UniProtKB/Swiss-Prot annotation:
Transmembrane segments: none annotated. Coiled coil: none annotated. Belongs to the metallo-dependent hydrolases superfamily. MTA/SAH deaminase family. Pathway: Amino-acid biosynthesis; S-adenosyl-L-methionine biosynthesis. Changing E150R: Lowers temperature stability by 10 degrees Celsius and decreases activity by 571-fold with 5'-deoxyadenosine as substrate. HAMAP family: MTA_SAH_deamin. It comes from the Archaea. The lineage of its organism: Archaea, Methanobacteriati, Methanobacteriota, Methanomada group, Methanococci. One of its GO terms (molecular function) is adenosine deaminase activity. This is 5'-deoxyadenosine deaminase.
Amino acid sequence: MILIKNVFVNGKRQDILIEGNKIKKIGEVKKEEIENAEIIDGKNKIAIPGLINTHTHIPMTLFRGVADDLPLMEWLNNYIWPMEAKLNEEIVYWGTLLGCIEMIRSGTTTFNDMYFFLEGIAKAVDESGMRAVLAYGMIDLFDEERRERELKNAEKYINYINSLNNSRIMPALGPHAPYTCSKELLMEVNNLAKKYNVPIHIHLNETLDEIKMVKEKTGMEPFIYLNSFGFFDDVRAIAAHCVHLTDEEIKIMKQKNINVSHNPISNLKLASGVAPIPKLLAEGINVTLGTDGCGSNNNLNLFEEIKVSAILHKGVNLNPTVVKAEEAFNFATKNGAKALNIKAGEIREGYLADIVLINLDKPYLYPKENIMSHLVYAFNGFVDDVIIDGNIVMRDGEILTVDEEKVYEKAEEMYEILRS
């Protein structure tokens, strides 16, 4: 049992009582309710829901700064994919731990990941105390033999993650994109998603080049093509990027309840474009936030994404009223929880105890009149305490689950292997 005393939460000073992995009570907590509770002093602190990053490639912390200032296809073909060919479980494990440290320190408690060597990722997630949805990244390049291997691996990893019996680690399916995956693979992904009741995590409409490739091959835009053979039917889908969209595609997204992972910083850095977020919001489409991998961002600080998502669309639409501060904050909290189907993203009784505490005695958080504005437009992301699944993962700036110095040392060692 954990008691956070006298913390600013949901607009006023209150106590938060945590029992097991859930929030038991918000309000005044009596002494008889907290026998043997660990007490955290919430004085001068605000409690916010843990942030939810809906599109990552976590081990790519080791690719940070490797290939900057390049277009997506050149970035992938000439730099990223050749380095990824050298990956193994150990490299992925240490890269993931490095990412978990970075996310915990910047208030992220849950992430939705697509990558390889999931045993290493799952081990790191388990040790760090984070919550994650993990998908094996599937690419068959329209080759039948490779397709069978990818589908076999995807199913193997779903069963592996389920066998861990860890409620913090959940499986998903991760077909990379329609320009790297065959129709046959994508159709089978839909079947597997229904069979195992897991979400689909996919890249869609990230660049004009990608859309052109799909149109040349199929005669249709990506969402229209996928919808033509029922890819979105009866499944929960998280579509990363969604930068260039036709009105017909947006109509499909609304009909099929597509969850969008908006990655504004990665899309800007790779010059992919700007997603039409105000248009998607007007249609009632669930918009969430992702950082993408560190190779294209180059960090995992979701507070930066919140700020950029709030200001970017004001600028490109010449309208200061679009994507208001609270709306942008919700992208990274309650909207992310909805996309991943977890009872989190809000500090409410009965919800998962994924809570972040921020010391308000910082110059950029004064005056204390409009804290939501400060969190979105002024905060740098350095949080003080992190609770995930009812466990204290970081206290007063010290991570309790991971040996940070060892991770930093091993990260350099793993990077040298990748660059050799």
